[in-house]
């Protein structure tokens, strides 16, 4: 009887594991790349409009959790199944492919859940 109960609970355990995997967060830190022209405004940079459209799509898909800028670094927190998936997703951005920006991607492990207004 105990084995039957365990067998019946197994699918619930597997679903729970998948949900946890879906909840992984990663931080992407953007800096300007070799294509960036310091004599041009951001909107005048090659591939900048495409970059903005790419990030807009990720926001609409609820992939981006939040974004911020500090100094010359842009930061987004995004959801992905694993680090490799996060990197692969971000490198679909034509601005990264053409080195308008550089990006570093790291696991983002929350230790304090605050709130933003």
Task: Mark where each language-model region is.
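Bacterial Sec-dependent N-terminal signal peptides
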Residues: 1-21
